[in-house]
Regions:
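Structured-RNA-binding interfaces characteristic of tRNA pseudouridine synthases
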Residues: 1-172
Length: 172
């Protein structure tokens, strides 16, 4: 945990509702590689993933759309704006980084489960479109395990800034 700045919050400040962007990271260690010191924050799988196919599928998730099929116990508004879904690979480590204005419960883990299906060759990248178009819960409610998920960053609007841009262009 790193604290980069500390300021008093205005009266009535609600950190959940006033966040502009949230960034989650999900770590996957593939090919049977094991790192005992990281096992509580990394999903370890035996499969080799097609990272290029995962990137193609991730690109189809970006934008403003209804994500009801990727949330659990969905109540209320289910439209979210995904600014970025980035899949990167370094050796056997695959990182999925998701930036959005808000998330539904279990949404990121469901997105990762969907990307894992693509990476394993069980679903074509364009299959993501069909999943997102459906109102039923994707993958029969399955989500990736929580151990790979980390809330990496929350961005709040700084005084005097407009409500535009992504986390990379704003102050935290």
């Amino acid at each position: 945990l790193v604290v980069r700045a500390l300021r008093p919050a205005p009266p009535g400040f609600d950190p959940r509702r006033e966040a502009r962007w949230r960034v989650y990271r999900y770590r996957i260690l593939m090919n049977g590689t094991r790192r005992p010191l990281e096992r509580h924050r990394t999903l370890e799988i035996d499969d080799r993933l097609d990272v290029e196919a995962m990137r193609a599928a991730a690109a189809r998730m970006v934008g403003e759309r209804d994500f009801a099929s990727l949330g659990s116990h969905v109540h209320g508004r289910t439209v979210r704006h995904l600014a970025e879904v980035r899949v990167t690979r370094r050796g056997d480590l695959v990182d999925v980084r998701v930036t959005a204005n808000a998330f539904l419960r279990r949404m990121v883990r469901s997105m990762v489960a969907l990307l894992l299906e693509v990476g394993r060759g069980r679903l074509a990248p364009d299959g993501v479109d069909r999943v997102l178009a459906g109102n039923a819960r994707a993958l029969h409610g399955r989500a990736a395990p929580p151990r790979g998920l980390t809330l990496e960053r929350v961005v709040y609007e700084a005084a005097g800034q407009s409500n535009q841009g992504t986390p990379e262009s704003t102050t935290t």
